[in-house]
């Protein structure tokens, strides 16, 4: 992408963020805001996992720990992660939810529809939190654009307009509701709360639509590679 955009001298370090021990992060290294869509589904080596108090081969879980550590007190985070993080019962998931709820005010969970991130193949949520005080209440919003998302029909600003409006006051609606953190199971810290304001409807994409999307992505990737080869 940088070649195609004409960026000849990028100020980018080729390194593995996760190879940095959390114990080495000092106050001068911290930030006020972290916005990220970390890679999920990947696996990290055992020696890299040793850098984290909550060890997991899942890269997204390691990144989330890194982001929390990198925030200053009062710092804010907005992190994309697989929706299974909300309910998985493995030790790492439970411990990480506990860490998040006890060290940060997780004020918003945005439940994204299938197809939000093309090619990801999984449903995602966005966690919005502020580091410092523990979580008191969590506001949930189920994003429903009313259509199947795809490469030619992506999520847009209009789809997020209601979320942005309601989130300012954490208002209840047919798509949003608030949960007191005291009601979370203290053994699992399960965050997969059902919408109390209406039946939860699961929309499955047609197999043909999925196949068409895969074919379109293959064509696009082939075209990009062709252009890169011409530049080499």
Language-model-detected regions and their locations in the chain:
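Short, conserved SAM-binding/catalytic segment
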Residues: 1-9
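A conserved structural/catalytic subdomain of Rossmann-like adenosyl-cofactor enzymes
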Residues: 14, 19-232
């Amino acid at each position: 992408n940088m070649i195609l955009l004409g960026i000849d001298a990028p100020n980018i370090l080729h390194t593995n963020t996760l190879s940095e021990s959390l114990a080495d992060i000092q106050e001068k290294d911290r930030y006020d805001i972290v916005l990220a869509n970390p890679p999920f589904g990947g696996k990290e080596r055992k020696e890299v996992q040793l850098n984290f108090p909550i060890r997991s081969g899942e890269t997204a879980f390691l990144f989330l720990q890194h982001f929390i550590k990198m925030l200053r007190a009062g710092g804010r985070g907005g992190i994309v992660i697989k929706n299974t993080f909300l309910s998985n019962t493995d030790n790492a998931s439970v411990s990480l939810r506990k860490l998040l709820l006890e060290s940060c005010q997780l004020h918003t969970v945005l439940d994204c529809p299938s197809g939000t991130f093309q090619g990801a193949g999984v449903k995602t949520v966005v966690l919005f939190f502020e580091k410092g005080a523990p979580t008191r209440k969590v506001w949930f919003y189920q994003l429903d654009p009313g259509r199947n998302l795809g490469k030619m029909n992506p999520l847009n600003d209009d789809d997020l307009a209601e979320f942005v409006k309601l989130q300012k006051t954490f208002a209840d609606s047919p798509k949003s509701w608030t949960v007191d953190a005291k009601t979370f199971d203290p053994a699992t810290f399960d965050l997969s709360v059902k919408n109390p304001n209406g039946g939860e409807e699961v929309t499955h994409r047609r197999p043909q639509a999925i196949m068409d999307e895969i074919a379109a992505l293959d064509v696009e990737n082939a075209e990009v590679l062709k252009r890169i080869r011409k530049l080499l």
